Amino acid sequence: FKRAVEAQDTETILAGFDRIPVKPGECFYVPGGIPHAIGEGIFMVELMEPADFAVRIEFERGGYTLPENARFMGRDIDFALSMFDFTARNLARTRKEFFVEPLELPLVGNAERFSLFDSRKTNCFRLERIRVNGNAAVDHHSFRVLIVTRGNGTLSCENKTLSLQQYDRVLIPYYVQTMRFSGKLELLAAMPPLNK
């Protein structure tokens, strides 16, 4: 594997990965140190825990070449590879360890809410899926980044109304108490962890 990384032999590198079939809406938690790649045709939202480092084993992508000092955090390849968990996992074990089952939260008006990432998997961030069908008011206890994954509608808060459509992103400040949605929307809401 080390020689393949040094030579940037992506065919050999990718031969060590098994393809995992995924469906729209599925969530996986990939802990630090687990080598992974995003396959062709996958459109996804990626959340990362706050960290000052990332190990890249692919140095060139889409015409951009990663500077040498950014490849292994200023260290050598042996240090970088020592951070990886090379445990072999079959598909069933991979899904069991990393697939996240949505946790249904109480209904809020015409909004279904599901916790995707929470203290079950990480204490670094939270992620909820919100499905609105009509009008719904969602109380707000944190700043959030909203990402519209389907549909269109409006978001009103603090005397402002925004039109929303698929792929829109909105930062909701901490001081906002309630978010009012209308329309048919599916959103992801990324938030910091709950204070203990």
List the model feature ranges, each with a label.
Residues F1-A4, G41, F125, R131-E158:
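Glycine- and acidic-residue-biased ligand/ion/polar-headgroup-sensing regions
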Residues F17-Y29, C157-V176:
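Short acidic-glycine-tyrosine-enriched beta hairpin
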Residues I130, G151, Y167, L187:
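Hydrophobic, well-ordered secondary-structure elements that form the walls
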Residues G109-N110, S119-C124, A137-H141, L146-T149, ...:
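A structural signal for short secondary-structure junctions
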Residues F1-I13, L47-R89, E186-K196:
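Double-stranded beta-helix
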